């Protein structure tokens, strides 16, 4: 117990003092995950929104494959990226292996199915509510996907935040393709694994506390996004009611029983 207490105290001192090595690892981890999420979300939002409204032969098979990718272990993604970027692989000429770019690619491939699947579900649910009205106005699938995605932007904001949490907490893929090189490809999760095996518990615990803080912050942002969405929908409903009253249209009528 004393060892744990001492390690926790030292970890808090490292955080409070702004240890250069710790901050470098945290900054690199945030940069990798943010870049990967930006790339994955740019493609995943568009693809998921289209899948939410499109109807084509083989759609069920595509959705089954997409759902399968949700359960792919991160180490398998790391292995695939490693094989692609190795010298004998098809992308070996890029020279990305054991680099920042390799970790971004691995995390982007890991997050892409999550963003696509969640976006598809959100847009498909919205399509079930508003799709018939949009179709009656002549909106084609591409336009409907954009309109519905914009209408569900608060829900999709939650998807983006959740995808960042998935990326920053990943360890297997970045360990394989990044190599955990000190000062170059060492991020929070790989550093925690390494420092724990070396017995440097204060640094590992300090990074763990920061990682927990990041995850907690993401959960708070998700809760705020949901509340923001509920408040926005409530305000829009109130303004619609006021417009109906202004036109002389009763918003709600109650008939008395005879």
Cite the ranges covered by each PLM segment:
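Cytoplasmic-entry segments and transmembrane alpha-helices of multi-pass inner-membrane transporters
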Residues: 47-81, 117, 251-255
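Hydrophobic positions within alpha-helical transmembrane segments of bacterial inner-membrane proteins
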Residues: 33, 37-49, 75, 79, ...
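Membrane-interfacial helix termini and adjacent extracytoplasmic/periplasmic loops
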Residues: 6, 10-13, 20, 77-109, ...
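Transmembrane alpha-helices
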Residues: 118-119, 141-173
């Amino acid at each position: 117990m004393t060892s744990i207490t001492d390690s926790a105290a030292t970890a808090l001192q490292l955080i409070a003092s702004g240890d250069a090595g710790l901050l470098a690892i945290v900054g690199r981890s945030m940069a990798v995950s943010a870049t990967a999420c930006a790339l994955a979300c740019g493609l995943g939002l568009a693809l998921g929104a289209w899948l939410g409204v499109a109807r084509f032969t083989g759609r069920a098979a595509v959705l089954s494959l997409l759902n399968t990718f949700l359960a792919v272990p991160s180490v398998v993604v790391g292995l695939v990226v490693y094989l692609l970027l190795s010298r004998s692989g098809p992308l070996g000429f890029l020279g990305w292996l054991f680099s920042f770019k390799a970790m971004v690619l691995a995390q982007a491939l890991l997050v892409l199915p999550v963003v696509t699947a969640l976006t598809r579900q959100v847009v498909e649910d919205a399509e079930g509510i508003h799709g018939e009205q949009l179709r009656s106005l002549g909106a084609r699938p591409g336009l409907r996907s954009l309109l519905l995605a914009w209408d569900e932007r608060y829900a999709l904001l939650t998807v983006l935040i959740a995808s960042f949490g998935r990326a920053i907490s990943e360890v297997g893929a970045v360990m394989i393709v990044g190599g955990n090189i000190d000062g170059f490809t060492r991020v929070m999760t790989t550093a925690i694994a390494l420092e724990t095996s070396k017995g440097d518990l204060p640094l590992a615990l300090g990074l763990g506390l920061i990682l927990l803080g990041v995850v907690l912050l993401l959960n708070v942002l998700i809760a705020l996004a949901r509340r923001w969405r509920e408040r926005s929908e409530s305000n829009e409903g109130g303004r619609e009611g006021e417009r109906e009253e202004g036109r002389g249209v009763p918003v709600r009528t109650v008939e008395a029983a005879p």
